[in-house]
């Protein structure tokens, strides 16, 4: 397994796919990194030379990835909550932030249902 930015990427996969194992790198960014490094997308990680791996590392290190990116996202959310914006309020309450409906659905964000017991209707 090759190690890039402290992450082990799988040897037997194509480089383009293997790079997506790093937080902050999707397919488009992986292709951009490989284009800058002038490496074929279809090459397998096990077939890369040490120079090519070093080149990928140097190009990838110019982006905000992994721990730094996670920290930036967390700080952005924290800032929204401190400022008191609507988005921050939704984060604080654990509800969907981007305008989705909550009457039905939104179970992923809200968690398991909390059922409320109804009062029994007394018959006359």
Curated annotation (Swiss-Prot):
Keywords: Ribonucleoprotein, Ribosomal protein, RNA-binding, rRNA-binding, tRNA-binding. Pfam families: Ribosomal_S13 (PF00416). SUPFAM superfamilies: S13-like H2TH domain (SSF46946). InterPro entries: Rbsml_uS13_C, Ribosomal_uS13, Ribosomal_uS13-like_H2TH, Ribosomal_uS13_bac-type, Ribosomal_uS13_CS. Residues 92-124 are annotated as: Disordered. Residues 92-117 have a biased composition (Basic residues). Coiled coil: none annotated. The keyword Ribosomal protein applies. GO terms for cellular component: cytosol; small ribosomal subunit. One of its GO terms (molecular function) is structural constituent of ribosome. GO terms for biological process: translation. PROSITE patterns: RIBOSOMAL_S13_1, RIBOSOMAL_S13_2. NCBIfam families: uS13_bact. Located at the top of the head of the 30S subunit, it contacts several helices of the 16S rRNA. In the 70S ribosome it contacts the 23S rRNA (bridge B1a) and protein L5 of the 50S subunit (bridge B1b), connecting the 2 subunits; these bridges are implicated in subunit movement. Contacts the tRNAs in the A and P-sites. Belongs to the universal ribosomal protein uS13 family. Part of the 30S ribosomal subunit. Forms a loose heterodimer with protein S19. Forms two bridges to the 50S subunit in the 70S ribosome. This is Small ribosomal subunit protein uS13. The gene is rpsM.
């Amino acid at each position: 397994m090759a190690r890039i930015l402290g992450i082990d990427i799988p040897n037997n996969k194509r480089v383009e796919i293997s790079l997506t194992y790093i937080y902050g790198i999707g397919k488009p960014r992986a292709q951009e990194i490989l284009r800058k490094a002038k490496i074929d997308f279809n090459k397998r990680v096990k077939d890369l030379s040490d120079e090519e791996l070093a080149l990928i590392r140097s190009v990838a290190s110019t982006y905000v990835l992994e721990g730094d990116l996670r920290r930036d996202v967390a700080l952005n959310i924290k800032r929204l909550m401190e400022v008191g914006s609507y988005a921050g309020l939704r984060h604080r309450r654990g509800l969907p932030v981007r305008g989705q409906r909550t009457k039905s659905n939104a179970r992923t964000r809200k968690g398991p249902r909390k059922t409320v017991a109804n009062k029994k209707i007394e018959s006359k």
